[in-house]
Amino acid sequence: VSTNDSTHAPFPGHPGAARRVSDRLPVFPWDKLEPYKRTAEGHPDGLCDFSVGTPVDPVPELIQQALAAHTDTPGYPTVWGPLALRESIAGWLHRRMGAEIGPEAVLPTVGSKELVAWLPGQLGLGPGDQVAYPKLAYPTYEVGALLCGAEPVAYGDLDELDGSKVRLLWLNSPSNPTGRVLGADELRRAVEWARAHRVLLVSDECYLELGWEAEPVSVLHPSVCGDSHEGLLAVHSLSKRSNLAGYRASFVAGDPVVVRELLEIRKHGGMIVPAPVQAATAVALADDAHVAEQRERYARRRGALRAALEAYGFRIEHSEASLYLWATQDRPCWETVAELAELGILVAPGDFYGPAGDRFVRVAFTATDERVAAAVERLKR
């Protein structure tokens, strides 16, 4: 058969192929920022990049040592990980989050983003189902719905949702991008709503140890969910707290029935955290000192950038937790992005996180002390 026959359908994955998955998805947001990044890189003193919240400080030595000590692991690791890892996760949840949970109800994941993106599909959601997430939100919540053919629904209040159609409800506290923290009363209301409608509630808590003017609470805390985790999952990451974005070290915890279902699915898909990273994760979660040290770094950078931005004319809203300042000049976000790029400063436009953010920018304080100091100088009028 001639391979040049124009009557043949395109190969799967080629342009024009039926059901090409990427056609469902929006343009990858960071690609739109590239022209502004090039402008900022042209500054004589170089780029001050506050756009992506990626760690820049060293991986703590004890974590590096744990990783190195487990590099001679030629065999396949397990999806669930060793009991020591799951006990470390459960111990951290109890010690730091006040959650009573056993090792049978936790599951390591290959970073938190892959879980967010693939969770709806792994739980069998599809056409006719709704995945709900906050109006200002991490874009991957929407992507996760689109990947499995479900309908993404952005909400401002739970009363806007049709509980008969929503199958998965995302919470995010502290919020990316706004840094807003949901109080225990708000979390309880969400849990009650989800349970009343038999909706799985998944709380993205990746910034929970980074509260500044507020003390974030986990959805798994007894004051929020009572004595049961039924219908609840919490997602946690070591990327920010331990500078492990390069390790892809995260986990999900909560309803043991749902965790077991995810385990069975992920075993078939081979979604496995490498054994050295599993060992490093267990050590990282058992140590609080390196987290306190990193918090001090972020607190200094946050204070310096906040003061400089406010002096420049920005208003900061929320931002009581997480690694971001949610800033506005009360004008379109891309105008602000362009203005700051001329100063060699790159920030994320607020509309990356939904139309409600179109007059804000997100400023990540994850750059080095030297780059933060450089930006502070450039913002002086």
Residues covered by each model-derived region:
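A short acidic, glycine-rich active-site loop
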Residues: 73-76
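PLP-dependent class I/II
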Residues: 2-27, 40-69, 84, 94-381
